[in-house]
A protein has these predicted regions:
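Conserved PLP-enzyme active-site core in the AAT-like
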Residues: 4-25, 29-266, 289-290
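Short, conserved charged micro-motifs
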Residues: 207-208, 286-294, 343-352
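Short acidic (Asp/Glu) and glycine-rich catalytic loops that position anionic groups and cofactors
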Residues: 211-214, 231-240, 275-285, 331-337
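PLP-dependent enzyme catalytic core of the Aspartate aminotransferase-like
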Residues: 241, 317-365
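Active-site loop ensemble at the mouth of alpha/beta enzyme cores that anchors a bound cofactor
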Residues: 282-310, 323-331
């Protein structure tokens, strides 16, 4: 717990370096703090930052800096019922078009979120990551990964992408990171911890600027606002999360719920993502228009029906009203996310979720 130079930091740093290969590891108290630092340096008015799909804190930190956040999901990501292996991918053609249109002077970096949380936790293929990396390097634009669920994404690559089945999840994760220039991460996801995040990169000048902001806003570079015990737990979590028995159980639990609900006729986002079951609120409540927030209505109904806490991922989170015209712009998708905590739940808990979700659907008239 030393203020500077605690052993816990060096274990954490070595663990992240071994996993990601990045030169500079900067701890923060949460993932959004890493985003804040990154976009404070690289964002700004007139800048455009593309992503397969930005999550809400990423988008908010970009927009607070004055930059514009642009989502470039593949078309199949917007069709919840369509079954495709990698619906989290970025539309490479759209990215190339944007790079040509705006130029490197207006695009300070390209982001890629793995797995794609705002598109139902869908995975991104290694091929897509590689192609985005190649495109960024051809334009000399840095490529950063939002690595919150890197291990789950690597598991999907292992089980779905040709030529990857014989490789370990850790090796696949290391390859993913090798195509990037840096990453942000929230430890509450695939760090398996209650708090913490980090910003990692190879660029020396960018790292120095980031540490300068870190000291003002988060803490010393060897703790970043975290207690030593949290850094120690974070390091341990990053080692445990690539365990394939853990990942198999984790992913199968989500698949189980999606399969059961789909068989009951409940509109779910397919195929099952990694960290959560996503209900298609637009199909669930077709009579509720986006300005009346079908996802939020469904989230409330699930709590009343089965005591199930969920999260709206739709127009409450991503919708906006044009200040000039007053016109409402809904989110691309209207969903409700049911994200189980890691490790504590058994199949009986999953069955309770099925009963609650299915019961709510059955009561609709």
């Amino acid at each position: 717990e030393s203020y500077a130079g605690a052993r816990s930091f060096y274990r954490f740093e070595n663990t992240v370096k071994d996993l990601t290969g990045f030169k500079h590891i900067i701890p923060t108290h949460q993932g959004r703090a890493a985003e804040k630092i990154l976009f404070e340096i690289m964002g700004g008015k007139g800048k455009v930052i593309p992503n397969n799909t930005h999550f809400d804190t990423t988008r908010a930190n970009i927009e607070v800096s004055g930059a514009a956040a642009v989502d470039l999901p593949v078309k199949e990501a917007l069709v919840p019922s369509m079954v495709k292996d990698f619906k989290g991918n970025m539309d490479i053609t759209a990215l190339e078009r944007l790079l040509k249109e705006k130029g490197p002077e207006h695009i300070p970096l390209v982001m890629m979120t793995v797995t794609n949380n705002s598109c139902a936790g869908q995975p991104v293929s290694m091929g897509c990551i590689r192609r985005v990396s190649d495109l960024c390097r051809s334009y000399k634009i840095p490529f950063f990964i939002d690595a919150c669920r890197f291990a789950e994404n690597a598991w999907f690559i292992k089980t779905r992408e040709p030529g990857c089945k014989g490789r370990s999840v850790k090796k696949l994760a290391q390859e993913m990171f090798s195509y990037a220039d840096g990453c942000t991460m929230s430890g509450k996801k695939d760090g398996l911890v209650n708090i913490g995040g980090f910003l990692a990169m190879n660029d020396d000048e960018l790292a120095q600027k980031a540490r300068n902001i870190l000291i003002v806003t988060e803490g010393f570079p060897t703790y970043g606002g975290l207690a030593g015990r949290d850094l120690e737990a974070f390091a341990q979590g990053l080692e445990e999360v690539v365990d394939e028995d853990y990942l198999r159980y984790r992913i199968r639990s989500t698949e189980y719920v999606v399969e059961k609900l789909d068989a009951m006729g409940v509109p779910v986002f397919k195929p099952a993502g990694g960290h959560a079951v996503y209900l298609d609120a637009k199909a669930f409540l077709p009579h509720v228009p986006p300005p009346q927030y079908p996802g939020q209505a469904l989230a409330c109904a699930l709590y009343l029906e089965g005591g199930i806490r969920s999260c709206e991922i739709g127009s409450v989170m991503f919708g906006r009203t044009d200040p000039a015209t007053g016109e409402f712009h809904p989110a691309m998708l209207e969903m409700v996310r049911l994200a189980p905590p890691r490790r504590p739940y058994t199949q009986s808990h999953m069955d309770h979720r099925v009963e609650g979700d299915g019961g709510g659907f059955a009561q609709l008239d």
